[in-house]
Amino acid sequence: MAKKILVVDDEPHVVKYLTTFLQDSGYETCSAANGEEAFVVLKQEKPDLVTLDLQMPNETGTRFYRNMTKDKELKDTPVIVISGIPGRHLAVSKPIAVFEKPIDRDALLATIRQTIG
């Protein structure tokens, strides 16, 4: 069974790019456009890893991360921050890795494979 990755980003072209790339690399994907939606998808889909943009409307990635780490079932889900704003990763205490947009696909894939296989 393929590992599942939740892609959280408010930019539809980024979501499409990442989900297509991850599916082509052998992973299942699900997605959300903001932190509020992401928390619902996270609870339903129980992905093996989350890629997280931090600056989004409605609910930020930072708030989503705080809510996720308070949930006993979800708090250990690995998170990779993908942000267009340098230094924003500091708002997330323990990401597996941080990537700035535009994304280095090879490095991202290597990090994912090292983290969840």
Indicate residue ranges for each PLM-predicted region.
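Short acidic/polar segment at the start of the alpha1 helix of CheY-like receiver
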Residues: 11-15, 105
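Charged docking surfaces used in two-component/phosphorelay signaling
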Residues: 16-24
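Acidic, metal-coordinating helix/loop segments flanking the phosphotransfer/catalytic sites
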Residues: 31-49
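Acidic catalytic/metal-coordinating carboxylates
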Residues: 34-37, 60-64
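Active-site residues of response regulator receiver
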Residues: 53
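Receiver (REC) domain active-site loop signature in two-component systems and cognate sites
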Residues: 56
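Hydrophobic/aromatic residues positioned on beta-strands within the core alpha/beta folds
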Residues: 82-83
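C-terminal output helix
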Residues: 103-116
